[in-house]
Amino acid sequence: MRHSTTLTGCATGAAGLLAATAAAAQQQSLEIIGRPQPGGTGFQPSASPVATQIHWLDGFILVIIAAITIFVTLLILYAVWRFHEKRNKVPARFTHNSPLEIAWTIVPIVILVAIGAFSLPVLFNQQEIPEADVTVKVTGYQWYWGYEYPDEEISFESYMIGSPATGGDNRMSPEVEQQLIEAGYSRDEFLLATDTAMVVPVNKTVVVQVTGADVIHSWTVPAFGVKQDAVPGRLAQLWFRAEREGIFFGQCSELCGISHAYMPITVKVVSEEAYAAWLEQARGGTYELSSVLPATPAGVSVE
């Protein structure tokens, strides 16, 4: 477990709230949804409207790119075959072809306009921050994340399980594997799972305010379609609305120093009831947040 982790909030009734709400939290069986797959080449499953739009746009542009690639490849192969010296004894001497030149000017313009017409609404949807149901401030540090719920007076830090802050050395060991198991994970989640998690309710608009404390980091959760640089001295915003309950992993996506690879992100999306129970417990005082809402492997409930 982490050597020293604190929560700021009301200091009274911590033990009572912990006992009262742990049972409610443990009834929440959370499937691990947003995570990289060995040998995977595609996107993680979409879990927000923003991610769904990005996936559609990627597929749309991929069709255009594939068509252009196939057309150009076939054109080159035809030119090599048709105008080979053996088949073209007398080389052509024309200098231009006006209809062809007009066509290869207009067609790219039409393609670019089409891409832009479908891309801009997706971009604007990401940049237009709606009214928040939940606001979370995220601060990037070397090499961990800090989370603050300003409306709830809750704040905590999040370290990778197996990092020096949790008693490890960023390598898998029997002790680290035991920590993962105690948190509800398996060794497959090493380098992804954290000792505490950002917890949000399902189907609610979450606005995340992102900043950095030392160098530039980047808070990224692929399943939500969000990535925002955490720049010291600046406060940026992103938003998402998770459409399904589960556990979603992300990672710092901006090279930030020697332990850049060891600052993952864990987001747990839960029901409104479980979220309310978590808030009540989290306000209770100082304890390990990993006990607030156990991470549970897919289909496994904690009894």
Swiss-Prot record:
Transmembrane parts of this sequence: 60-80, 104-124
Entry keyword annotation includes Metal-binding: yes
Gene Ontology molecular function: copper ion binding; cytochrome-c oxidase activity
Keyword Secreted: no
Subcellular location: Cell membrane
Enzyme Commission identifier(s): 7.1.1.9
Binding-site positions, Cu cation: H217, C252, C256, H260
EC primary class: translocase
Cofactor note: Binds a copper A center.
Membrane-related topology note: Multi-pass membrane protein
GO cellular component: plasma membrane
Signal sequence residues: 1-25
Cofactor list: Cu cation
Key words of the record: Cell membrane, Copper, Electron transport, Membrane, Metal-binding, Respiratory chain, Signal, Translocase, Transmembrane, Transmembrane helix, Transport
Disulfide bonding pattern of the chain: none
Catalyzed chemical reaction(s): 4 Fe(II)-[cytochrome c] + O2 + 8 H(+)(in) = 4 Fe(III)-[cytochrome c] + 2 H2O + 4 H(+)(out)
Alphabetical list of Pfam families matching this protein: COX2 (PF00116), COX2_TM (PF02790)
Gene Ontology terms describing biological process: ATP synthesis coupled electron transport
InterPro entries to which the protein is assigned, alphabetical: CcO_II, CcO_II-like_C, Copper_CuA, Cupredoxin, Cyt_c_oxidase_su2, Cyt_c_oxidase_su2_TM_dom, Cyt_c_oxidase_su2_TM_sf
NCBIfam families assigned: CoxB
Function: Subunits I and II form the functional core of the enzyme complex. Electrons originating in cytochrome c are transferred via heme a and Cu(A) to the binuclear center formed by heme a3 and Cu(B).
Family classification: Belongs to the cytochrome c oxidase subunit 2 family.
Protein name per its UniProtKB record: Cytochrome c oxidase subunit 2
Organism in which the protein naturally occurs: Cereibacter sphaeroides (Rhodobacter sphaeroides)
